[in-house]
């Protein structure tokens, strides 16, 4: 898979991508760009996401054979909770299980809000839980369900994978999936 920066190519006005029958473009929407990261309450920057959706739709129209995978960061929906509850510093026990679940719920809320904006723009975005398609081994994250992701892309969906929490075999029992 080749990684392209949609916005850079759009801004520079480049007219073509390398031609490939199954070209995949991975677009990472940074959490600090699509959310008000410093806000105490999690908020999506709707105008920014709507503009990104508009540009993505134009990109797809221009390069219809290119398949897209969207990634998004945690922004104000994840980072403040991870830091507040010190989720990466201590084992998950007792009330910290609730803290972990609350963080995961917040990230799902973010994915649902983003999906709603993309759907209203006519883009067939399918939110996927990153922790369901990724695994960890020796502190390295890897795709564990590549066939499922390939099938979703081949059907014509645009998978949306985002910041997430995952259980691992380490001191804290969990990690942030953010890249």
Question: How would you describe each model-predicted region?
Answer:
Residues 37-39, 79-84, 137-140, 171-173:
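Short acidic, glycine/serine/threonine-rich loops at helix termini
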Residues 2-69:
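N-terminal glycine-/serine-/threonine-rich phosphate-binding loop
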Residues 45-87, 92-104:
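N-terminal active-site beta-alpha-beta segment that forms phosphate/nucleotide-binding
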Residues 158-160, 167, 174-179:
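Conserved mixed alpha/beta catalytic, RNA-binding, or beta-rich assembly cores of soluble enzyme
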Residues 26-30, 71-72, 128-129, 160-162:
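Short beta-strand segments
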Residues 84-165:
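Ligand-binding beta-strand-loop-alpha-helix segment within the catalytic cores
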Residues 33-35, 75-80, 133-136, 166-168:
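Short, active-site-adjacent cap segments at secondary-structure transitions
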Residues 43-47, 141-147, 174-179:
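Charged helix-capping and loop-helix junction motifs
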């Amino acid at each position: 898979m080749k990684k392209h920066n949609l916005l850079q190519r759009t801004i520079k006005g480049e007219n073509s991508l390398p031609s490939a029958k199954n070209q995949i473009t991975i677009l990472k929407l940074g959490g600090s760009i699509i959310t008000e990261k410093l806000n105490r309450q999690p908020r999506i920057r709707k105008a920014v996401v709507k503009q990104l959706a508009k540009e993505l739709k134009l990109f797809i129209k221009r390069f219809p054979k290119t398949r897209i995978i969207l990634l998004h960061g945690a922004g104000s929906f994840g980072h403040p909770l991870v830091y507040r509850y010190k989720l990466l510093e201590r084992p998950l026990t007792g009330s910290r299980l609730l803290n972990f679940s609350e963080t995961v719920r917040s990230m799902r809320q973010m994915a649902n809000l983003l999906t709603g904006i993309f759907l209203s723009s006519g883009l067939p975005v399918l939110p996927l839980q990153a922790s369901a398609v990724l695994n960890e081994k020796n502190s390295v994250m890897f795709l564990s369900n590549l066939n499922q992701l390939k099938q979703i892309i081949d059907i014509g969906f645009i998978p949306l994978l985002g910041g997430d929490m995952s259980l691992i075999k380490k001191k804290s029992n969990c990690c942030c999936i953010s890249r």
